[in-house]
């Protein structure tokens, strides 16, 4: 089974990240992949609190903590570097933690990746997630 890692940067918006993880869990149900989520905490000043309802369709949810606030792009770069060096995976899907990216689109990315395995798949947001 192919392994997918969803990479989510966050700064202080733990409520939105919790909602995103719940939505991902719902939307990956029945897909023939193993899903894990890595949340990269950009040195949030608010208490870290994930309130996740259900993880039935996810292998794991882990949080990486940045030592200092470095910004959205640096969180993604740090997460990608960590994944490349430490994880066994076929695909990485970066998703904003604030609802900008829609979890229901994951299946379309994976369909395209299976159809064109040697290509990088890029999406364009036309509608905010919620």
Task: Mark where each language-model region is.
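Short, conserved active-site loop motifs that form the nucleotide-linked donor/cofactor pocket
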Residues: 4, 35, 61-62, 118
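Short helix-capping segments at alpha-helix termini
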Residues: 28-33, 55-60, 88
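Short beta-strand/loop segment that forms part of the nucleotide-sugar
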Residues: 33-43, 64-66
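A conserved acidic beta->alpha catalytic loop
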Residues: 41-50, 99
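Acceptor/aglycone-binding surface of glycosyltransferases and processive sugar-polymer synthases
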Residues: 66-68, 72-82, 91, 100-130
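Hydrophobic targeting segments
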Residues: 2-9, 17, 24, 35-40
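Short, well-formed alpha-helical segments that are part of the catalytic scaffolds
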Residues: 13-28, 47
